[in-house]
Structure formats: C-alpha cells, structure tokens
Amino acid sequence: MQRYVNFFDKNRRDVHGLLLLDKPTGFSSSFFLNKIKKLFYAKKVGYIGTLDPIATGMLPICFGKATKFASYLLNSDKRYRVLVKLGESTDTFDASGVIIRIADVQCNKEKIEECLKSFLGTSLQIPPMFSSLKYQGLPLYKYARRGVNIPRKSRTIHVYSLYCLNQLNSIIELEIHCSKGTYVRSIVNDIGEYLGCGAHIISLRRLMVGQYIASMMVNIKTIESIFFDKDLNDLEVLDKLDNLLISTETIMCSF
C-alpha cells in the first residue's frame, strides 16, 4: 500500500516535535531514522545518541524546530539495562564481535558488588575503537575492522549508579545511570578485566534520556499500523502520527 503519492507531490511536510522511538535490535539508528522520515513524510529529522544495531530502546528523533534543541538531549544523562556474559571477551566488547579470550568465572555476588562500586563517580574513559566517533571523516569502527588502531583522547564521564539486578551462573543483568558520552560497552569490558575473567555485552537497552522515561516510548509497529490502516485516509493518518509526537517545549523543561 502506498500513501501520499497523490496527496503530496514534491515537498515533504513541516513536522515539529519529538518522537521517542523504541528502537528494535538488528538495524542501525540511521536505518530507523530514514524509515521514520518516510512514514511521517517529514522535511527535517534527526536522531540523538546513536544506538548500535545490537542495542534496543529509546532513540529520540527530533522533527523540525525540535532539532534546534537536540544538544540539550545529547548532553543529558542516560539509563541502560544491560545483559553481560562473564568469562568471554570480544574485540567489539559485545556479542557482535569475535571472541578473543575465554576464562573461568570465579567470582561471587560480593566480588561483583565490590567491582560495580569501583565504577561509581567521575572517571576518565577512552572511547572504544568499535564506535561511531569519527577520525578524518571516517567512523572509528571502519578503522577497527581493518585492524588499524587510532589514538583516542580520554573523556570525563560520571556513573551515578551501577548495580546488579540478576545473576545466573556467568550471566549478569546490570542497570547503569551515567552521563553523556559514556560507553557502556567499555565499562562492561573493564568489569571483565576487574574480575579477571573478561566480559562482553549480550544485549543493551536504553531506558531513559534526560527526563524522558521508558513508558513514553513508541514502538515502530504502532507507527506502521497507523500508516497502513486502510480505514484511514491520508489526512487522518498524518493526524494520528503527529499525535505520537511530544511537544518541542518539553525538551527545555528540565534545563
């Protein structure tokens, strides 16, 4: 089913607001940005805070005037739920990479809690090579795939909370509240080093960005169900889609 073909000819719509997309796993943030732009038939859109293909959860997408305030969200704290595999290290620090180390897991609950506490507060973190940070116009992960290591500057991060929700043998579930620019995959890798057994991320879910919480997210299937609803005409579809957006003014509420 194709919509808007006759309703719109050349120009896309002026759409303003914020969509908190619940990004599924398996695809890049850019993939879903382009998809949302087409579904909303919007002129100007942009997302805040890249989520890797393996990651899910809150991907803020700004429309129109909201893009002017994107930096406020980019600089906001984030909260994540992360599933970690102890005893295995990978070159990417997550399950998408190649296993480069296997070790026995010999740590109890007390040792893990001691480890997590050591990451609280302010520290310096070097961004991982497998990241979207750019060097001479190319993201670092492209250099990493070629086996090229690029020197990176450390950056200041702050971990407000980090605790273990569940543990089953070598699998632990963590929740972390951290500042902007924090690479959770690097923290997980460092946890593995601290425990002496290695570790990598199995799954990562972003639960919060700034003042926006998980219950405010919109599933991509919800958006598609509106778009493909045969009982709605084009104007009704656009109206229902626009109702999913959060007002631009809310971005400034906590600043």
From Swiss-Prot:
Keywords associated with the record: Isomerase, tRNA processing
HAMAP family assigned to the protein according to its UniProt record, in alphabetical order: TruB_bact
Residues reported to bind substrate: Y80, Y183, L204
Protein transport in keyword set: no
Source species, domain of life: Bacteria
Source organism of this protein record: Blochmanniella floridana
Catalytic residues of the enzyme: D52
Protein known as: tRNA pseudouridine synthase B
Higher taxonomy: Bacteria, Pseudomonadati, Pseudomonadota, Gammaproteobacteria, Enterobacterales
